[in-house]
Amino acid sequence: MSESWFALSRADQAEALEVAAGRTGRPAHLLEKDIWVVWALSAIYGSPLAEKLTFKGGTSLSKVYKIIDRFSEDVDLTYDIRELVPDLLQGGHPIPVSASQEKKITSAVRTRLPEWIAGWVKPVLEGSLVSSNAQAEFRVDGKDREKLIIDYRAVKTGTGYAEASIQLEFGARATGEPNSRHMVHCDIAPVIEGVKFPVAAPLVMVAERTFWEKATAAHVYSLQGRLRGERYSRHWYDLAAMAKTGHAAQAAGDHQLARAVAEHKSVFFAEKDANGSKVNYHKAVTGGLQLVPAGAALAALESDYTAMLEDGLLALHQPSFAEIMEKCLAIQDEVNHKARDGQ
């Protein structure tokens, strides 16, 4: 019978991670971190929370769809807006019909979501920690206390760019749809026998919606030129990877999905460009998408991408930053062309 990963001694864990690193080419500290990512998903989706949360973002692209070949440590989860604030939705419709309704919903989400995280998610993880015989601590973070951080006792360490923690970031201003159920396994599992690793079955947002989420985020950055934390260059890396797998082209042809993302972001994530003008998301998805920034904004992205490479967050033989930008420019042209043809 296989022994649980968390039942192994730290020495045995370290040895297994080193062996796996040699066999996979991935840094040992990231293989360890990946175990905790899957553990967190396993705890959440093995609980009553499973039907109310949608797993999305870059981690879903790597762990579920195998589109990107980079380590993604942040777990983005959408708690269905219809579950959190049903009393504020007109006819159950998730998009507000007025600015005043949006303000009421946003205010309620900022109050209720942290309460839900503390009252429901944290206890689920704490219970799973005990039953797994794992060692970690939890803390709430974020401006609106919408993040739950799992600080684990690391066996292996890297350069420090990737810390020994997992960030669960929750949002509750969308439905998380469209989505479907998928299995998720630890990267180390296929190369280490005789050990039982965490396994999860999350409800996952479709990759095409993730494309539009990332494309509109890149569009906003290109107009603003303001870097939002470390690893922000991951969005452009992911977009370029989605072009190779055909997901970008498929998303570009889904005009209804593009408009849905634009409508949602226009209401809940209004932004202003560098000149103070309101960012027009609808223009972005109807022929005016801009994915490649210029000047200092481009240089900041390149520095961030270099840091990702240095800590091994990306697998070997990755494209250069210039190649990624070239691919994103091609995506931009294709998306805009299809959008204009589809009008």
Go through each PLM region and give its residues.
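Structured mid-to-C-terminal alpha-helical surface segments
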Residues: 1-53, 65-70, 75, 81-343
